[in-house]
Amino acid sequence: VPNDNPVTSPAPLRHLLAEVAMARLAEAQALNEEALRQALSQGRPAKCKARILAVVSSKGGVGKTTLCAALASTLHLKGGQTLAIDLDPQNAMQYHLGVQPDVAGMGSASLTGESWSDLLLPGSAESLLLPYGALTEEERHTLERYMANDRHWLARQLARMTLDENDVVILDTPPGRTLYLEQALDVADQIVVVTNTDAASFLTLDQMDSLLATPNMRAPSSEYSYVVNQFDASREFSRDMHEVLKRRLGGKLLGVVSMDHALGEALAYGHNPLLGAGSSPACQDLLNLSEQLKSRLEF
């Protein structure tokens, strides 16, 4: 007589499989712990050949990830590839670069010892993306403990990727001072601080300047600059704040990107506005910014 009841795995088998998976993860973490101990005894690794750009901000909501994705789409050196690495647990860069959401990413690879190069995903405009990936709270704490215990953790990860001198790596970091930011500052050749023409952003400038001036916080040869994002020229207060920022930042002000709601709408529709025939003022600002950074990276 046919059995119409669905076949289910016995509970003990599910438990055994879960135990095997947990044991595998524990073994990988133990290997990582041993690798960390060995790495710490070796000091700082050799500098990665690729040009590294860190995009940072003191506060959220300034359009940092959107700007980071725009640079990943437009900033290319001849003969090289451009990689965006999402160091932000929000894991939002994948949506900006038109990449299908993936569970695997930088986080899980770092815990299991996988090569970051094997997890790169193709994004828009021939860019490549290493997403942050999906982690449990416990896994994220473990990852951040690795970073806290090894000042040059990110430098070691990048060194394993065997990148070329014409490659560009763009790092998207969480807002504020975090372990991810400190790791990014340790390896970056160029640091772009994204700010807005609002009072809250202005009040964080001293905090960021102080951090960037902290001894040994960033690579000795690195340079940093500011970009004013989402500038609304139709508002008098925004125009006044723009003038205040120009005076405050002086030569550290690299560029200004106009407010353009179409950039956010493009994310909703899954296309890259920088690749279209018609170019808005904001798109042109982003292209100009990309060219300026390209000239700085071509050393």
Regions found by a protein language model. Name each.
Residues 78-82, 87-132, 254:
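Phosphate-binding loop that captures ATP/GTP phosphates
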